[in-house]
């Protein structure tokens, strides 16, 4: 139904554009500035056209869409945000893994290495690594050597399980298992320097405890315990 689609360049699977109608105008925003994107969206919207700003994954995670929404609000233009599947969720599916395993990690830290875009104080990799929680690291696959150093400096052991997920959910998706200490080696061996997520933590191992939710000794709002806790051990 869209009359105009502005999509986020190499980050969006081009196969999605095949669903556009024949007369739809399609623009690649990879070489565009924020102002150029807005200059394309506003006239089309004011003319009653259906405009789609197509981001990768879910726009709420490193999508740079707040600045676009603020401008549209100032111009009095209505819009809808359609939730997507973030690549960190797609990466878990590719890994066939669960980020929040009982007695392993009940928290997921989504972050990135500092590059040309700085990160605030106390939000650097080493600071977060000190928690020992599951970490999903965006926009950092070209800095795996430094990433490994910061993870270890923060408290992860070099042999902590890690995985690099390249182009999660794409047809050419690739999963590389490694450790915190071998991240750089694994990335180089597989020619991965962009379009990849890095996951770190014990959730990639084999040790965890059974959840209480489906434990027959556990009572919750929808079910009474059916056996004594001692008998379930």
Please provide the spans of the model-predicted regions.
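Structural recognition of alpha->loop->beta junctions
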Residues: 3, 72-78, 102, 183-192
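Hydrophobic packing residues within well-ordered alpha-helices of enzyme cores
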Residues: 16, 72, 91-92, 147, ...
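Active-site catalytic pocket residues across diverse enzymes, especially alpha/beta-hydrolases
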Residues: 20, 95, 151, 155
């Amino acid at each position: 139904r869209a009359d105009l689609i502005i999509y986020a360049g190499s980050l969006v699977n081009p196969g999605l554009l095949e669903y556009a109608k024949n007369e739809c105008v399609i623009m690649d925003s990879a070489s565009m500035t924020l102002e150029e994107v807005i200059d394309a969206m506003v006239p089309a919207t004011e003319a009653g056209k259906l405009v789609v700003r197509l981001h990768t994954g879910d726009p709420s995670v490193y999508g740079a869409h707040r600045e676009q929404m603020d401008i549209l609000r100032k111009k009095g233009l209505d819009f809808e945000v359609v939730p997507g599947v973030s690549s960190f969720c797609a990466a878990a599916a590719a890994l066939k893994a669960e980020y929040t395993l009982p007695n392993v990690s009940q928290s997921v830290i989504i972050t990135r290495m500092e590059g040309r875009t700085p990160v605030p104080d106390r939000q650097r990799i080493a600071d977060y690594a000190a928690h020992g929680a599951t970490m999903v690291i965006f926009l950092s696959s070209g800095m795996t050597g430094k990433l490994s150093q910061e993870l270890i400096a923060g408290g992860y052991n070099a042999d902590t399980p890690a995985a690099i997920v390249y182009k999660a959910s794409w047809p050419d998706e690739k999963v590389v298992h490694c450790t915190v200490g071998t991240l750089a080696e694994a990335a180089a061996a597989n020619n991965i320097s962009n379009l990849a997520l890095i996951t770190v933590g014990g959730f990639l191992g084999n040790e965890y405890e059974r959840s209480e939710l489906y434990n027959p000794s556990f009572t919750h709002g929808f079910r009474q315990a059916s056996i004594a806790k001692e008998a379930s051990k």
